[in-house]
Amino acid sequence: EKELSLWREAGADRYLLRFETSNPELYKSIHPSLTGQEPDRLELLRTIKRIGYETGSGIMVGIPGQTFDDLAKDIETFRDLDLDMIGVGPFIPHQETLLGRKAKTPGILPEEQVPNTELMTYKVMALARLVQPLANIPATSALATLNTPTGRELGLSRGANVVMPNLTPKKYRALYEIYPSKACIDETAADCRSCMHRRIRSIGRQVGEGRGDSPSYKKA
């Protein structure tokens, strides 16, 4: 807490920490901790909020072992934490990771497993908007990876209100391939900016100006 407070005093005013899942056992299975070092992300998010940061968090949809009950609890957690920003993205497996190679979901029935689909992600985004109507909710690059032609546009029509342009220099983008076939990996930052503007205008929306503070944070 002291370190977070010092950063806040030094000028930091936003903090993003995904809790990934509200199910502690599922969280441990995807983020194994060293013995005696098991951070409580939910409690840390409460501390971040109390210190005065614009607070963002979020989840993956369709993690192996994630049930619909887990997902319902996640959505309730968005509300309980009173998040200013909510990131919701599909789990896209990467075969170079242990989680990406996990073929089975032990402990749950197949029909209980949340699908990591585009449609399910839209449903969660829409529900997140209902429980936190003033939060910033991004249409993510993961959605654009699942549906390159219209993923971001559909996200903006199903609860999202912001996008996150990729400013990473083109020559470094391939070094951050967190999932296969990531969208826009060959674009320059300028290409990305003009593309985002075009996509937003295509659905009758306007590009905002200013810092982009969450309406939820402004309310507080």
Pin down the residues of each PLM region.
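A cross-domain feature marking catalytic cores of carbohydrate-active enzymes
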Residues: F19-T21, T55-V61, V88-P90, A139-S141
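Auxiliary Fe-S-binding modules of radical SAM enzymes
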Residues: R79, M85-A220
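Conserved non-cysteine loop/helix-boundary elements of the Radical SAM core domain that shape
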Residues: E1-G52, M60-D82, T97-E118
